[in-house]
């Protein structure tokens, strides 16, 4: 759902990618608004959030007014999975971290206090595999965990959240800074070389603990160096205050050489199916027929085993066309992929969605059922069946399928959306409000989520599991900001 939309829930597209406003910058920046250490106490109703969380929440509120986010689960789930995997292994609380994917062409990522990490899709498109993504996120997590500061704490403390957000969102653009009233202030957001070096050092430790190859950070620097060489005009002025990418790259390479006698047991940097799905999703917004070869090159089809290339080629082109809303172009590609491999549940779930969008319900149902028979652990197929049953007023079956989807992936926004619709049809206003709230929360609209949760709280029976769950959701939004 696009931000700014108001009113009752209505059917929305499952693609979930939204355009972005504004500029950014190439350097990896870490935004800290505090003068103290970040802490993660156990959540209690009566406890106030730590100062880092309060400042982070304030920044997120401001960011939601300037950024627009990629919400497609094929993108968001992968970033969350990699990020939470690292956080869980370094002694931090994974529930205190939030990962955002911003729709912006510039390669960039940054962290703010309290565990809020932003990565731009322009950076995701420059990375080559999950190992490099892990390197990016490990570096930002290290900034949070090591409680790094701006160079001039007193000057930073004098800036308000809106000004800091304006500086970061301007991408160093002088005109934008002037309009934001932040001209000549971006110098206050410079980072120390020691902090950047320490973040790199800890990132390598975090990668090892998380089961990723330590070379992920090195490969990430190589990707940024390539981008910088081909796009020198996009590097903002204050990026020079950070250690140069090549200097940082050499330092990491030297460290890895010194420890080369220790076996690296982390995950390699192979291109996974999930990574290719993410890349196809991000590339789909501008796809045309003449772009097919470019898209396939970006997803490195040539590096796949030769016997798998034709299947992968048709599958990924079908996926890109589906994400672009070009269902008539997607279906023949999926049919070819299915002809080459009739046992892949993803192909059937995706083509079921295409048929659903074309209102070919019989074919959609058949393909969704086939996907579920091949794998009961893929939420989108259950969502499609839930939608079909809901449209036929088979509410019991619809709720069953949508519940199954949430058991697999509780963050599936469409399962929450259609459950709200199902409970509306069944006149269960309390559950309708609860699942509406979950939908709004997952779509980064915490204000509407809180409104629906408070409505749900007044509609359900007190001291029931649903009542306690509603209270828990309310507490979490107030504590985390979303």
Where are these regions (language model features)?
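Extracytoplasmic and endomembrane cell-envelope/extracellular-matrix remodeling and assembly machinery
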Residues: 42-47, 57, 69, 77, ...
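Canonical positions in the second alpha-helix
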Residues: 303, 337, 370-371, 404-405, ...
């Amino acid at each position: 759902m696009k931000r700014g939309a108001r009113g009752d829930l209505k059917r929305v597209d499952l693609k979930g990618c939204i355009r972005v406003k504004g500029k950014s910058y190439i350097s990896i920046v870490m935004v800290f608004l505090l003068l103290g250490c970040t802490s993660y106490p156990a959540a209690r109703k009566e406890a106030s959030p730590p100062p880092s969380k309060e400042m982070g929440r304030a920044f997120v509120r401001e960011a939601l007014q300037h950024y627009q986010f990629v919400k497609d689960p094929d993108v968001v789930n992968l970033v969350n999975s990699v990020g939470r995997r690292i956080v869980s292994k370094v002694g931090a609380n994974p529930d205190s971290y939030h990962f955002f994917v911003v729709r912006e062409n510039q390669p960039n990522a940054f962290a703010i206090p309290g565990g809020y990490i932003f990565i731009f899709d322009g950076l995701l498109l420059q990375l080559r595999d999950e190992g490099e993504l892990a390197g990016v996120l490990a570096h930002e997590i290290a900034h949070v965990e090591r409680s790094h500061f701006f160079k001039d704490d007193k000057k930073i403390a004098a800036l308000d959240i809106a000004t800091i957000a304006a500086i970061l969102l301007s991408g160093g653009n002088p005109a934008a800074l002037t309009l934001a009233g932040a001209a000549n202030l971006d110098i206050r957001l410079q980072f120390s070389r020691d902090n950047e070096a320490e973040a790199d050092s800890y990132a390598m430790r975090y990668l090892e603990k998380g089961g990723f190859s330590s070379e992920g950070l090195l490969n990430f620097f190589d990707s940024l160096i390539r981008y910088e060489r081909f796009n020198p005009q996009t590097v903002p002025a204050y990026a020079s205050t950070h250690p140069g990418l090549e200097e940082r790259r050499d330092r990491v390479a030297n460290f890895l050489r010194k420890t080369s006698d220790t076996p690296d047991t982390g995950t390699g940097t192979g291109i996974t199916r999930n990574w290719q799905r993410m890349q196809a999703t991000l590339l789909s917004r501008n796809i045309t027929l003449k772009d097919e070869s470019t898209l396939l090159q970006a997803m490195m089809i040539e590096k796949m085993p030769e016997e798998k290339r034709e299947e992968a080629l048709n599958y990924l082109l079908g996926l890109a066309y589906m994400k672009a809303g070009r269902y008539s172009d997607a279906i023949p590609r999926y049919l070819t992929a299915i002809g080459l491999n009739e046992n892949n549940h993803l192909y059937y779930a995706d083509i079921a969605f295409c048929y659903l969008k074309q209102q070919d319900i019989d074919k959609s149902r058949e393909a969704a059922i086939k996907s579920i028979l091949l794998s009961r652990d893929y939420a989108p197929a259950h969502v499609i069946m839930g939608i079909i049953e809901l449209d036929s007023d088979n509410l019991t079956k619809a709720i069953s399928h949508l519940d199954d989807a949430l058991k697999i992936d509780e963050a599936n926004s469409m399962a929450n959306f259609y459950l709200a619709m199902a409970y509306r049809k069944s006149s269960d206003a309390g559950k309708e409000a609860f699942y509406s709230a979950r939908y709004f929360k997952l779509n980064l609209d915490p204000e509407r989520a809180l409104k629906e949760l408070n409505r749900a709280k007044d509609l359900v029976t007190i001291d029931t599991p649903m009542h306690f769950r509603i209270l828990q959701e309310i507490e979490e939004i107030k504590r985390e900001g979303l």
